[in-house]
C-alpha cells in the first residue's frame, strides 16, 4: 500500500516564492519564531507549606547570626581559634552542621572512596644519626651490641590516647599542673565545646564505613596543636575505613616531620595489631599504607624503620614488602633506605626489604653498594643457619650489581658463600660473581666480522 502523501508543506512552493519576490523584491521571508509556552497564571502565586517553612527557617537563622554579630558575642570555638589554634576560620554552626551532614551520608556506597588516586609527589630523604631517637618517646628502643636487645617499657596507643584526653579535660577544669618544659611551650587550654565536638567526631569515626568526613576532622592538620585534638577522636577506636581517610588527609596536609610522627604513633601500632589478630592486613589499612608512600621520606622514617627495629616478623615483612614492591619509590629515597637498613641487626625481615629495594634495579651509589657488601660479610659471625630469604637477597644483589663491586669485595662475598652458602642458591651466587667483570674493569666485547 503506498504511503499517504503529506498534506502540510514545510514551505511554500517555488512558483509562489518567485511570484511574491517579483512583487516585494525579496525571494523568501524569514519565518517568525513563535515560542510555545504553557499557560501561566496571571494572578498571585501561592507557596506550599514545605517551601514556606524552609524560607522562615532560613530567615530565622540569618536573624540570629545578625543578632550575634551586633551583640559582639563570638562562640567558644571562634575565640579558641583567635588565640592561634587555627589558621582558617571555624565556627560552631559549621562543625555541628558538618557532623549532622556526615551522619546522613554514612550509608553512601564506599566504592568511590578508595578509587581516587592523587598525583604522586616525593620529597627528599635525609638520613642522620638522630633517626633512632625518633621513636624513643612512645616505642621501645634497641641498644647494646649485636644480639643484646634491651627493651624499655612501651606505651600502647590506647594508653597514650587516654593520657592525652585526661590532660585535656584537666586543663579545661584548671586542675592540670604542667611541667617546666610544658610551661614554656604552653598553649591555651582547649574549650569544653571543642572537647565535646571532637569527642562526637571520634564516635562517628568509630562507626564510619563510607560517606563524607566531618569538616571539623579535615581541619585538624591546619591546627597548631593538631596532635592533642587528634587524640580526642580516639584513633584506637577508628574503623579501618576511617584510618584510610585519615591517612589520606594527614599525609597530604602535614609537614614531613609531622606526617612521620603520625605514621609512627597512629598507623604503625594499628597495622601491627591487625596483622597479629587476623593473620593478614585489612584492605583499607593496606590502601592507607600505599597512600602514605605519597611522602616516602616520612614513610621510611615513620613506619618502615620503626617496624624493623621492633622485631618485625616475616609475615609483617611479606605484607609491607608487597606494598613497597607495587609503588614506585624515587632513587634517592631507595638508596638512603638501603643504607639505613644495612645498619640494623641481621634478620630475615631486613633481608626481605633489602631484596625488594634491590629488585627495583636502580643505579645505586658506590657508598650504598659498599655498605651492602659489609652487611653480607656480617653473616660469617652468625651462629644460626641463614634463612632462604637471606640467601635470596644476596643472590639478587649479585645478579643486579655484580659489575659495580671490586674484586676484593667479590672475594669476600665468595668466602661468605663458602661458609654460609645454601646448597642450591650458593652455586648461583658463585656463578654470578665469577663470570662477570668488576668495578673499573673493561667489559670485553666480541667483534663479529
From Swiss-Prot:
InterPro entries: Bystin. It comes from Schizosaccharomyces pombe (strain 972 / ATCC 24843) (Fission yeast). Pfam families: Bystin. Residues 1-13 have a biased composition (Basic residues). Residues 73-84 have a biased composition (Polar residues). Belongs to the bystin family. This is Uncharacterized protein C13G1.09. The keyword Cell cycle does not apply. One of its GO terms (cellular component) is nucleus. Residues 1-125 are annotated as: Disordered. PANTHER family: BYSTIN (PTHR12821:SF0). Coiled coil: none annotated.
Amino acid at each position: 500500500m503506498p504511503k499517504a502523501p503529506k498534506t502540510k508543506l514545510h514551505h511554500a512552493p517555488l512558483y509562489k516564492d518567485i511570484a511574491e519576490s517579483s512583487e516585494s523584491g525579496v525571494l523568501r521571508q524569514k519565518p517568525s519564531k513563535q515560542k510555545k509556552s504553557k499557560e501561566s497564571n496571571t494572578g498571585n502565586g501561592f507557596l506550599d507549606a514545605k517551601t514556606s517553612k524552609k524560607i522562615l527557617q532560613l530567615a530565622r537563622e540569618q536573624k540570629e547570626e545578625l543578632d550575634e554579630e551586633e551583640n559582639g558575642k563570638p562562640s567558644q570555638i571562634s575565640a579558641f581559634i583567635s588565640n592561634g589554634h587555627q589558621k582558617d576560620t571555624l565556627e560552631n554552626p559549621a562543625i555541628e552542621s558538618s557532623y549532622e551532614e556526615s551522619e546522613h551520608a554514612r550509608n553512601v556506597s564506599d566504592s568511590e572512596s578508595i578509587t581516587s588516586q592523587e598525583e604522586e609527589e616525593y620529597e627528599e630523604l635525609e638520613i642522620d644519626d638522630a633517626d633512632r631517637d625518633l621513636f624513643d618517646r612512645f616505642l621501645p628502643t634497641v641498644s647494646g651490641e649485636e644480639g643484646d636487645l634491651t627493651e624499655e617499657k612501651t606505651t600502647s596507643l590506647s594508653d597514650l590516647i587516654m593520657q592525652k584526653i585526661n590532660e585535656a579535660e584537666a586543663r579545661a577544669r584548671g586542675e592540670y599542673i604542667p611541667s617546666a618544659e610544658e610551661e614554656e611551650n604552653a598553649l591555651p587550654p582547649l574549650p569544653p565545646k571543642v572537647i565535646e565536638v571532637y569527642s562526637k567526631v571520634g564516635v562517628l569515626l568509630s562507626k564510619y564505613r563510607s560517606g563524607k568526613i566531618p569538616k571539623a576532622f579535615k581541619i585538624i592538620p591546619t591546627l597548631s596543636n593538631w596532635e592533642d585534638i587528634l587524640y580526642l577522636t580516639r584513633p584506637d577506636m577508628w574503623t579501618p575505613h576511617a584510618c584510610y581517610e585519615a591517612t589520606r588527609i594527614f599525609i597530604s596536609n602535614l609537614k614531613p616531620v609531622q606526617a612521620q610522627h603520625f605514621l609512627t604513633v597512629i598507623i604503625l601500632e594499628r597495622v601491627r595489631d591487625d596483622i597479629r589478630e587476623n593473620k593478614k592486613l585489612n584492605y583499607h589499612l593496606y590502601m592507607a599504607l600505599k597512600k602514605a608512600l605519597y611522602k616516602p621520606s616520612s614513610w621510611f622514617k615513620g613506619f618502615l624503620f620503626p617496624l624493623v627495629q621492633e622485631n618485625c616478623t616475616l609475615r609483617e615483612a611479606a605484607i609491607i614488602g608487597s606494598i613497597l614492591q607495587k609503588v614506585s619509590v624515587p632513587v634517592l629515597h631507595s638508596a638512603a633506605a638501603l643504607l639505613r637498613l644495612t645498619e640494623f641487626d641481621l634478620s630475615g625481615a631486613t633481608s626481605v626489604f633489602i631484596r625488594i629495594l634491590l629488585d627495583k634495579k636502580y643505579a645505586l651509589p658506590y657508598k650504598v653498594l659498599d655498605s651492602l657488601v659489609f652487611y653480607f660479610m656480617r653473616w660469617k659471625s652468625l651462629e644460626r643457619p641463614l634463612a632462604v630469604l637471606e640467601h635470596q637477597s644476596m643472590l639478587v644483589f649479585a645478579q643486579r650489581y655484580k659489575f659495580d663491586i671490586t674484586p676484593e669485595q667479590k672475594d669476600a662475598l665468595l668466602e661468605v658463600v663458602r661458609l654460609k652458602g645454601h646448597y642450591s642458591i650458593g652455586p648461583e651466587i658463585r656463578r654470578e660473581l665469577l663470570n662477570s667483570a668488576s668495578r673499573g674493569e673493561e667489559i670485553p666485547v666480541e667483534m663479529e666480522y
